[in-house]
Amino acid sequence: ASTQGISEDLYNRLVEMATIIQAAYADLAIYNAQTDINGASGNQAFASY
């Protein structure tokens, strides 16, 4: 299926945004795992619920 013009641009931007968000969640998960391993309370900005 071929998309053209603006819709293709929009699709590419959405994919890029999703990739960035996914990477951010992965970084956060790694940060939380390291915090748990270290036994520290960690940064309040990343506090668990």
Swiss-Prot record:
Its EC number is 3.1.1.73. One of its GO terms (biological process) is xylan catabolic process. GO terms for molecular function: feruloyl esterase activity. Involved in degradation of plant cell walls. Hydrolyzes the feruloyl-arabinose ester bond in arabinoxylans as well as the feruloyl-galactose and feruloyl-arabinose ester bonds in pectin. Active against methyl esters of sinapate (MSA), but not caffeate (MCA). The keyword Secreted applies. Its main location: secreted. It comes from the Eukaryota. Keywords: Carbohydrate metabolism, Hydrolase, Polysaccharide degradation, Secreted, Serine esterase, Xylan degradation. It is found in: Secreted. One of its GO terms (cellular component) is extracellular region. This is Feruloyl esterase A. It catalyses: feruloyl-polysaccharide + H2O = ferulate + polysaccharide. Belongs to the AB hydrolase superfamily. FaeA family.
